Amino acid sequence: MLQTKNYKFWFCTGSQDLYGDECLAKVAQHSKQIVDELNKTGILPYELVWKPTLITNELIRKTFNEANADEECAGVITWMHTFSPAKSWILGLQEYRKPLMHFHTQFNEEIPYDSIDMDFMNENQSAHGDREYGHIVSRMRIERKVVVGHWSDSVVVGKIASWMRTAVGIMESSHIRVMRVADNMRNVAVTEGDKVEAQIKFGWEVDAYPVNEIAESVAAVSASDTNALVDEYYDKYEILLEGRDPEEFKKHVAVQAQIELGFERFLEEKNYQAIVTHFGDLGALKQLPGLAIQRLMEKGYGFGAEGDWKVAAMVRLMKIMTAGMKDAKGTSMLEDYTYNLVKGKEGILQAHMLEICPTIAEGPISIKCQPLSMGDREDPTRLVFTAKEGHGIATSLIDLGNRFRLIINDVECKKTEKDMPKLPVATAFWTPEPDLYTGAEAWILAGGAHHTAFSYDLTAEQMGDWASAMGIEAVYIDKDTKIRDFKRDLMLGEVFYR
């Protein structure tokens, strides 16, 4: 389900014909070597493709338009090896519509003190060539990422790799389609939002379907398919009967297996990559989807509870951005539930009624069947686990009425002090940066929701870059946050983002 296009990124080097064929040949040789070496590092998540040196207005414009037309091109990385008069770039930049990086580097790492002469100076002019180019991009108010450093530095390569994932998120955002099989929870404000504006800003298509239409897809799943999936569950997860009759327990598990298969087939048939449900609108469904939704999230689908389509789209987006990542720790919807306010042990218990993605799990994953007061249906089965320790980010996309705001909080996930044997749901426990009190105050001042799209594998910088590309405000809550400054930033955002 996380399959995307076989994306590539173009590496475009700027120069001009003033320097002659010998110099331009070296420019091409150097840029090819940089591309080859970057691809060999194994750090980049996508292939970098070398393009011939751009030396004229016509060639620049042609190359950028070819990048626009190439469905596999997810972005262009530009670098000025020599001086490249920036007026030559205006038309190409005006017509370019994909993510852009300005890589401010140079071929040589060190000044060749003993041999440097004017030929070398003319050939290696990134220090001022990139400033000329940077000026025109800034003057044109074009959003781009700037990465500075030598191309052989693994830290610098890591920054390029990180941006590539953001760029793919930017590209894939316009392909996200969210299926609403339930409306927003009655009287809840923060999960509401302008779906038309979301499609204009982010490219998201958010559509409603009657819950009984997807329930028919569930009912159409054969007993043999359902039983095969139940067998898979029993092989993969621990089964915690907790005194329930084994056959009765298995029937409850089978309901979720049937929901998983029916939902997935319906989503694939209708071409949707995210879904929202609501315990108050279950139609003919026998249980609130729990284990089924958890499994769909694990496959890469986005999910939002109680009609929260913004979280569903954000979870899908963040799963796309982390696709194929080595040693990924996971991405999920989470919800702020309750605090631990004991001094020195502060934190927020994260959970939901059922639907937390098992990609964030550490240790055993169990199936439990417990009553649920909401929904007025059978006791639903769900996967129960505790989340990994480590650093992550919690994001909340909110609608302020006239615009969107993305709130990004760095958090530290920890082990809970004690087990919670009577709590039959998956949980995480984190302390927001810079501390619980400042983090929670800033979150509330910014208008953040109780539902979040959370990931161990993305950074605040990556999500902020995505927000900038979408033309919306991003506010950061991190180790440096001070409430007085944060409130000032919110006031400035009100003026700038209109």
Predicted features along the sequence, with ranges:
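Periplasmic-binding protein-like
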Residues: 73-83, 101-103, 272-277
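Cap/lid and interdomain-hinge subdomains that line or gate substrate/regulatory clefts
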Residues: 45-47, 104, 109-244
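Short catalytic helix/loop segments, enriched in acidic residues and glycine
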Residues: 25-41
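Short, well-structured alpha-helical segments in soluble
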Residues: 60-73, 90-92, 260-269
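C-terminal catalytic subdomain
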Residues: 300-425
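Long, internal scaffold/assembly segments composed of regular secondary structure
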Residues: 232, 236-324
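Short beta-strand segments enriched in small/hydrophobic residues
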Residues: 3-26, 175-184
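Extended hydrophobic packing segments that form well-structured cores
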Residues: 376-498
